[in-house]
């Protein structure tokens, strides 16, 4: 929770929580878990944008928040030839100030953008998200039931990004890699493990990725927009 909520929440009748786990930090407050409101796009299905690379390879969405993330960008650049060789399709959201020409010879499977307004469509239709772990991103991944590799911003206040990432990692829906542990080798080995093909009843599938998807489906989520409205209406009548 933020400092205002942490120190003055006890004065409120109730504090509405984005994560159940936040309750342990607000022991003197009455709390209700509602989830966090998201952009409207996340509450409906969106088709994959036409500009996304076509093909049968797994689709990765790599992003670092509105300002991008230089550490994530750098690892992606270092591993790009490996990813293309493995037939991944990559949409790389680099952030406003980080766009630069970067091409892999003879490949149309990599697209770089400063930002996009179609992030819901990308997350809903991709196979894996690689990202920082701000609260908004965590809730978007939960709503879309999407597996991820999360690399928390190491200088976030009270290390909250790592705590956010631990929620999904503990559920088995995400792999958490701290930035100081991240390297080209660790990144590539993690992807190879997640996308290792296993045969079952004559059909090939990604065993680890499928398990991560199932774990994300089991995560608690609430349509928070309606849930919060319900409590606001109730409190207005009561008080």
Q: Where do the protein language model's features map onto the residues?
A:
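Active-site-proximal region of nucleotide-activated glycan assembly enzymes
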Residues: 1-47
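Alpha-helix C-terminal capping/helix-to-coil transition sites in glycosyltransferase folds
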Residues: 10-11, 121-125, 143
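Donor-nucleotide binding loops and adjacent catalytic segments primarily
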Residues: 43-131, 162-166, 170, 177-187
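Acidic donor-binding loop of glycosyltransferase active sites
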Residues: 124-139, 146-147
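Short hydrophobic beta-strand element within catalytic cores of glycosyltransferases
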Residues: 131, 147-158
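C-terminal "capping" alpha-helix adjacent to the active site of nucleotide-linked donor transferases
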Residues: 171, 176-178, 182-207
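A short, well-ordered alpha-helix in the C-terminal region of glycosyltransferases
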Residues: 204-222
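C-terminal alpha-helical cap of glycosyltransferases
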Residues: 221-239
């Amino acid at each position: 929770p933020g400092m205002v909520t942490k120190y003055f929440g006890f004065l409120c009748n109730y504090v509405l929580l984005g994560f159940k786990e936040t309750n342990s930090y607000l022991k003197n407050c009455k709390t209700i878990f509602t989830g966090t409101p998201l952009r409207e796009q996340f509450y409906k299905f969106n088709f994959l944008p036409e500009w996304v690379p076509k093909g049968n390879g797994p689709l990765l969405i790599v992003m670092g928040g509105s300002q991008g993330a230089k550490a994530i960008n750098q690892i992606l650049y270092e591993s790009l030839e490996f990813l293309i060789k493995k037939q991944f399709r990559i949409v790389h959201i680099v952030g406003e100030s980080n766009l630069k020409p970067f091409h892999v010879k003879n490949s149309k499977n990599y697209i770089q953008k400063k930002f996009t307004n179609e992030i819901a469509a990308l997350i809903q239709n991709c196979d894996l998200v690689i990202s920082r772990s701000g609260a908004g991103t965590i809730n978007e991944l939960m709503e879309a039931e999407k597996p991820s590799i999360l690399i928390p911003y190491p200088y976030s206040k009270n290390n909250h990004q790592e705590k956010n990432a631990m929620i999904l990692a503990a559920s088995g829906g995400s792999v958490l890699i701290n930035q100081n542990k991240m390297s080209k080798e660790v990144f590539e080995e993690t992807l190879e493990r997640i996308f290792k093909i296993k045969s079952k009843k004559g059909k090939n599938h990604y065993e680890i990725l499928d398990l991560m998807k199932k774990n994300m489906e089991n995560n608690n989520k609430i349509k928070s927009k309606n849930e919060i409205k319900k409590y606001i209406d109730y409190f207005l009548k009561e008080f």
